[in-house]
Amino acid sequence: MTKRFIFQQILDQGIDRGFIPGKSEESRAWFREQASKLSTIRPERFMKRQGAIRNQVSNIWRPGELYLFRYDPLHKETLPYYDRFPLMMLIDTYTDGFMGLNFHYLPPLMRALLMERMYRFLNNENFDEKTRILLSYQKLKTLSGRPLYKPCLKRYLNNQVMSRFVKIHPAEWDMILMLPLDRFVKKRRSAVWRDSKTIYQGRK
Protein backbone atom coordinates (compact mmCIF):
# COMPACT_ATOMS: atom_id res chain seq x y z
CA MET A 1 0.00 0.00 0.00
CA THR A 2 1.25 3.47 -0.89
CA LYS A 3 2.11 5.33 2.26
CA ARG A 4 0.35 8.71 2.39
CA PHE A 5 2.79 10.39 4.77
CA ILE A 6 2.96 13.85 3.16
CA PHE A 7 -0.78 14.44 2.94
CA GLN A 8 -1.86 12.47 5.99
CA GLN A 9 -2.49 15.51 8.20
CA ILE A 10 -4.62 17.17 5.52
CA LEU A 11 -6.54 13.95 4.95
CA ASP A 12 -7.20 13.57 8.67
CA GLN A 13 -8.35 17.18 9.01
CA GLY A 14 -10.60 16.90 5.99
CA ILE A 15 -12.25 13.72 7.20
CA ASP A 16 -12.81 15.32 10.62
CA ARG A 17 -14.63 18.15 8.83
CA GLY A 18 -16.75 15.70 6.86
CA PHE A 19 -14.81 15.94 3.59
CA ILE A 20 -14.18 12.63 1.84
CA PRO A 21 -11.45 12.70 -0.85
CA GLY A 22 -12.96 12.92 -4.32
CA LYS A 23 -16.56 12.51 -3.19
CA SER A 24 -17.88 15.94 -4.14
CA GLU A 25 -16.82 19.16 -5.84
CA GLU A 26 -16.77 20.90 -2.45
CA SER A 27 -14.57 18.18 -0.98
CA ARG A 28 -12.13 18.26 -3.88
CA ALA A 29 -11.89 22.06 -3.67
CA TRP A 30 -11.12 21.90 0.06
CA PHE A 31 -8.32 19.36 -0.33
CA ARG A 32 -6.82 21.30 -3.23
CA GLU A 33 -6.85 24.53 -1.26
CA GLN A 34 -5.07 22.92 1.68
CA ALA A 35 -2.47 21.25 -0.54
CA SER A 36 -1.71 24.51 -2.36
CA LYS A 37 -0.21 25.78 0.90
CA LEU A 38 2.53 23.11 0.73
CA SER A 39 4.72 25.24 -1.51
CA THR A 40 8.08 23.94 -0.27
CA ILE A 41 7.58 20.22 -0.98
CA ARG A 42 10.30 18.90 -3.29
CA PRO A 43 9.86 15.98 -5.72
CA GLU A 44 12.85 14.20 -4.17
CA ARG A 45 10.82 13.75 -1.00
CA PHE A 46 8.25 11.68 -2.87
CA MET A 47 11.02 9.51 -4.29
CA LYS A 48 11.70 8.24 -0.76
CA ARG A 49 8.24 6.78 -0.35
CA GLN A 50 7.79 3.18 0.60
CA GLY A 51 6.16 1.04 -2.04
CA ALA A 52 7.81 2.65 -5.08
CA ILE A 53 7.94 0.17 -7.95
CA ARG A 54 10.79 -0.71 -10.25
CA ASN A 55 11.76 1.63 -13.04
CA GLN A 56 10.31 -0.43 -15.89
CA VAL A 57 6.73 -0.57 -17.12
CA SER A 58 5.23 -3.93 -16.20
CA ASN A 59 1.92 -5.75 -16.10
CA ILE A 60 1.11 -4.22 -12.72
CA TRP A 61 0.61 -0.88 -14.46
CA ARG A 62 -2.91 0.06 -15.42
CA PRO A 63 -4.08 3.02 -17.52
CA GLY A 64 -5.63 5.73 -15.40
CA GLU A 65 -3.16 5.47 -12.50
CA LEU A 66 -1.01 8.44 -11.48
CA TYR A 67 2.77 8.24 -11.06
CA LEU A 68 5.70 10.51 -10.23
CA PHE A 69 9.20 9.66 -11.47
CA ARG A 70 12.48 11.20 -12.61
CA TYR A 71 13.18 11.30 -16.33
CA ASP A 72 16.11 12.20 -18.58
CA PRO A 73 15.02 12.53 -22.24
CA LEU A 74 17.10 10.73 -24.86
CA HIS A 75 17.38 13.73 -27.20
CA LYS A 76 17.17 16.50 -24.61
CA GLU A 77 19.60 18.70 -26.54
CA THR A 78 17.03 19.16 -29.30
CA LEU A 79 14.03 19.76 -27.03
CA PRO A 80 12.89 23.34 -26.32
CA TYR A 81 12.27 22.26 -22.69
CA TYR A 82 11.37 19.20 -20.63
CA ASP A 83 10.26 18.18 -17.15
CA ARG A 84 12.68 16.11 -15.05
CA PHE A 85 9.92 14.95 -12.66
CA PRO A 86 6.77 14.10 -14.63
CA LEU A 87 3.49 13.72 -12.76
CA MET A 88 1.94 11.36 -15.24
CA MET A 89 -1.36 9.56 -15.62
CA LEU A 90 -0.74 6.44 -17.69
CA ILE A 91 -2.63 6.02 -20.96
CA ASP A 92 -0.86 3.20 -22.78
CA THR A 93 2.30 1.06 -22.71
CA TYR A 94 4.67 -0.11 -25.45
CA THR A 95 7.56 -2.55 -25.63
CA ASP A 96 10.08 0.26 -25.14
CA GLY A 97 8.08 2.75 -23.09
CA PHE A 98 4.74 4.30 -22.34
CA MET A 99 2.46 7.27 -23.00
CA GLY A 100 0.67 9.44 -20.50
CA LEU A 101 -0.52 12.87 -19.42
CA ASN A 102 2.08 14.95 -17.60
CA PHE A 103 -0.05 17.39 -15.59
CA HIS A 104 2.94 19.66 -15.00
CA TYR A 105 2.48 21.18 -18.45
CA LEU A 106 -0.59 22.98 -17.10
CA PRO A 107 -0.84 25.46 -14.20
CA PRO A 108 -2.47 24.00 -11.06
CA LEU A 109 -6.01 25.27 -11.65
CA MET A 110 -6.04 23.93 -15.20
CA ARG A 111 -4.69 20.59 -13.96
CA ALA A 112 -7.63 20.41 -11.59
CA LEU A 113 -10.06 21.27 -14.39
CA LEU A 114 -8.66 18.53 -16.62
CA MET A 115 -8.84 16.01 -13.79
CA GLU A 116 -12.45 17.02 -13.04
CA ARG A 117 -13.39 16.33 -16.64
CA MET A 118 -11.70 12.93 -16.59
CA TYR A 119 -13.51 11.86 -13.41
CA ARG A 120 -16.47 10.90 -15.60
CA PHE A 121 -14.39 7.82 -16.53
CA LEU A 122 -13.71 6.65 -12.95
CA ASN A 123 -14.08 2.91 -12.43
CA ASN A 124 -15.42 3.60 -8.92
CA GLU A 125 -15.88 6.55 -6.56
CA ASN A 126 -14.19 5.02 -3.52
CA PHE A 127 -10.83 6.73 -4.17
CA ASP A 128 -9.05 3.71 -2.74
CA GLU A 129 -6.20 1.50 -4.01
CA LYS A 130 -8.41 0.04 -6.75
CA THR A 131 -9.63 3.37 -8.10
CA ARG A 132 -8.42 4.44 -11.52
CA ILE A 133 -9.64 6.38 -14.51
CA LEU A 134 -10.63 4.19 -17.45
CA LEU A 135 -8.56 6.29 -19.78
CA SER A 136 -7.66 6.09 -23.45
CA TYR A 137 -6.64 8.58 -26.11
CA GLN A 138 -10.03 8.20 -27.77
CA LYS A 139 -11.79 9.08 -24.51
CA LEU A 140 -9.60 12.15 -24.05
CA LYS A 141 -10.86 13.48 -27.38
CA THR A 142 -14.46 13.29 -26.12
CA LEU A 143 -13.87 15.60 -23.13
CA SER A 144 -15.87 18.81 -23.13
CA GLY A 145 -14.29 22.24 -23.43
CA ARG A 146 -10.86 23.06 -24.77
CA PRO A 147 -8.48 20.11 -25.27
CA LEU A 148 -6.40 20.70 -22.15
CA TYR A 149 -4.87 17.26 -22.52
CA LYS A 150 -2.97 18.13 -25.72
CA PRO A 151 0.11 19.87 -24.23
CA CYS A 152 0.28 17.18 -21.51
CA LEU A 153 0.36 14.18 -23.83
CA LYS A 154 3.90 12.75 -23.74
CA ARG A 155 5.66 9.53 -24.67
CA TYR A 156 8.48 8.21 -22.47
CA LEU A 157 11.19 5.59 -22.97
CA ASN A 158 11.81 2.95 -20.33
CA ASN A 159 15.58 3.29 -20.55
CA GLN A 160 15.44 7.02 -19.79
CA VAL A 161 13.56 6.65 -16.50
CA MET A 162 16.08 7.52 -13.77
CA SER A 163 14.14 6.50 -10.66
CA ARG A 164 11.53 4.15 -9.35
CA PHE A 165 7.90 4.98 -10.03
CA VAL A 166 5.96 6.43 -7.12
CA LYS A 167 2.27 5.58 -7.44
CA ILE A 168 0.06 8.36 -6.13
CA HIS A 169 -2.84 7.12 -4.04
CA PRO A 170 -6.21 8.18 -5.55
CA ALA A 171 -7.13 9.97 -2.30
CA GLU A 172 -4.17 12.25 -3.00
CA TRP A 173 -4.82 13.05 -6.65
CA ASP A 174 -6.57 16.36 -6.08
CA MET A 175 -3.87 17.48 -3.66
CA ILE A 176 -0.73 16.58 -5.57
CA LEU A 177 -2.00 18.49 -8.61
CA MET A 178 -1.52 21.68 -6.59
CA LEU A 179 2.14 21.11 -5.70
CA PRO A 180 5.09 22.73 -7.55
CA LEU A 181 6.86 19.42 -8.18
CA ASP A 182 7.76 20.18 -11.80
CA ARG A 183 11.41 20.71 -12.64
CA PHE A 184 11.50 22.18 -16.11
CA VAL A 185 14.81 22.53 -17.91
CA LYS A 186 15.58 25.33 -20.41
CA LYS A 187 12.43 27.34 -19.64
CA ARG A 188 10.61 28.57 -16.57
CA ARG A 189 7.30 26.93 -15.77
CA SER A 190 5.46 30.18 -16.58
CA ALA A 191 6.84 30.11 -20.14
CA VAL A 192 5.93 26.43 -20.51
CA TRP A 193 2.39 27.17 -19.38
CA ARG A 194 2.09 30.00 -21.91
CA ASP A 195 3.12 27.62 -24.67
CA SER A 196 0.61 25.06 -23.42
CA LYS A 197 -2.13 27.67 -23.54
CA THR A 198 -1.45 28.36 -27.21
CA ILE A 199 -1.68 24.60 -27.87
CA TYR A 200 -5.02 23.94 -26.18
CA GLN A 201 -6.45 27.15 -27.61
CA GLY A 202 -5.53 25.93 -31.08
CA ARG A 203 -3.06 28.70 -31.84
CA LYS A 204 -0.02 26.45 -32.23
Q: Language model features by range: what are they?
A:
Residues D96-H104:
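Short, solvent-exposed secondary-structure boundary/capping segments
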Residues D72-L74, T93, L106:
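Generic structural motif
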Residues T2-Y67:
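Mixed-charge, Lys/Arg-rich low-complexity intrinsically disordered regions
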Residues E65-K76:
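Hydrophobic beta-strand signal
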Residues K76-T95:
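Short beta-strand-centered aromatic/proline hotspots
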Residues L106-K204:
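Intrinsically disordered, low-complexity, charged/polar segments
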Residues Y67-F69, M88, G100:
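Hydrophobic beta-strand residues in large extracellular and virion-surface proteins
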